[in-house]
From Swiss-Prot:
SUPFAM superfamilies: Ribosomal protein L22 (SSF54843). It comes from Caldicellulosiruptor saccharolyticus (strain ATCC 43494 / DSM 8903 / Tp8T 6331). The keyword rRNA-binding applies. This protein binds specifically to 23S rRNA; its binding is stimulated by other ribosomal proteins, e.g. L4, L17, and L20. It is important during the early stages of 50S assembly. It makes multiple contacts with different domains of the 23S rRNA in the assembled 50S subunit and ribosome. The globular domain of the protein is located near the polypeptide exit tunnel on the outside of the subunit, while an extended beta-hairpin is found that lines the wall of the exit tunnel in the center of the 70S ribosome. Keywords: Ribonucleoprotein, Ribosomal protein, RNA-binding, rRNA-binding. HAMAP family: Ribosomal_uL22_B (MF_01331_B). GO terms for molecular function: rRNA binding; structural constituent of ribosome. It holds the Pfam family Ribosomal_L22. GO terms for biological process: translation. Belongs to the universal ribosomal protein uL22 family. Part of the 50S ribosomal subunit. This is Large ribosomal subunit protein uL22. Gene3D superfamilies: Ribosomal protein L22/L17 (3.90.470.10).
Length: 122
């Protein structure tokens, strides 16, 4: 019988989550697909010049994740990159739009839960 080799090399990671953002996950995914696997400084520069509303949410969240990495995990900011970033749907607010002849259509105000995971490059 062979002994199990213990490869306990724990990788430090810093996360930040924005919950209940009043924007559709589909609209945020357009922005987050542009910065996935990029270094954080490059990602911030990209977000600064994207003329989409979702970019403001993601930029603020990324700055929060960088602060978490620096203060809570003592990580080097220059080596950080975006390992994971995703937007999932949150609860929908349902509203009514009155239509002709007493009908009503449903308006779905979608919310998002956006998560960023940062890791250090070797």
């Amino acid at each position: 019988m062979e002994k199990a080799v213990n490869t306990n090399t724990e990788v430090k990671k810093a996360t930040a989550t924005l919950r209940y953002a009043m924007i559709s996950p589909r609209k945020v995914r357009i922005v987050i697909d542009l910065i996935r696997n990029k270094p954080v400084q490059e990602a911030l520069n990209i977000l600064k010049f994207i003329p989409k509303r979702g970019a403001r949410f993601v930029e603020k969240l990324l700055k929060s994740a960088i602060a978490n990495a620096e203060n809570n995990h003592n990580m080097n900011v220059d080596k950080l990159y975006i390992a994971e970033i995703y937007a999932n749907g949150g609860p929908m607010l349902k509203r009514i739009r009155p239509r002709a002849q007493g009908r009503a259509f449903l308006i779905r105000k979608r919310t998002s839960h956006i998560t960023v995971v940062l890791k250090e490059r070797e």
